[in-house]
Curated annotation (Swiss-Prot):
It comes from Pinus koraiensis. This is ATP-dependent Clp protease proteolytic subunit. GO terms for molecular function: ATP-dependent peptidase activity; ATPase binding; serine-type endopeptidase activity. The gene is clpP. One of its GO terms (cellular component) is endopeptidase Clp complex. The active site is at S101 (nucleophile), H126.
Length: 196
């Protein structure tokens, strides 16, 4: 029997009685966001909407983004990364489990000095990939140009946010590079590893 999303009590300011809300809504009210699936347009839009709402609600309170993400689509991932850069509150990123591919890109998008990995978390970086394209060659050429442009942007972000030289980032994005939490800290993807 599926459990579903648990309900927890929540008392809004000024209310006498608590109401039951699903766990994630309760956590969102505390500015705690979760990316726990492949990144797609739907989850990216939900998280970006929550970030805008929380920023408008109180621009002085930090937002915490917990990441256990095996990757996902490049365009929604880049949109989520960009949103993290433009909202006023600092966004803490916390890797719990795995941050692979686009998940690692979101992880580096946290406020520098506020990016963390749990002790047994794993990080994987690689270049953005195109899906197999079965269409006219001219359209494939356009997609290849777009993927190259995205790769250049992602490379630039890794260089800026990890403080590694371009040749290191270029080399490491050419293949799957897996890291422990400690290795991710040494690489500059996270700033701290939680004590465990």
């Amino acid at each position: 029997m599926p459990v579903g999303v648990p309900k927890v009590p929540f008392r809004a300011p000024g209310d006498e009685d608590a109401t039951w809300v699903d766990l994630y809504n309760r956590l969102y009210r505390e500015r705690l966001l979760f990316l726990a699936q492949d990144i797609n347009h739907e989850i990216a839009n939900q998280l970006m909407g929550l970030m805008v709402y929380l920023s408008a609600e109180d621009a002085n309170k930090d937002i915490f983004s917990f990441i256990n993400c095996p990757g996902g689509s490049v365009i929604p991932g880049v949109g989520l990364f960009d949103m993290m850069q433009v909202i006023v509150p600092n966004v803490h990123t916390i890797c719990m489990g795995v941050a692979a591919s686009m998940g690692s890109f979101i992880l580096i998008g946290g406020e520098i000095t506020k990016r963390m990995a749990l002790p047994h978390a794993r990080v994987m970086i690689h270049q953005p990939a195109s899906s197999y394209y079965d269409g006219p060659a001219a359209e494939f050429h356009n997609e290849a140009k777009h993927i190259t442009m995205l790769r250049n942007y992602i490379t630039k972000c890794y260089i800026e946010r990890t403080d590694n030289p371009e040749e290191v980032i270029q080399r490491d994005l050419d293949r799957d590079v897996f890291m422990s939490a400690t290795e991710a800290r040494a690489y500059g993807i996270v700033d701290t590893v939680a004590e465990g």
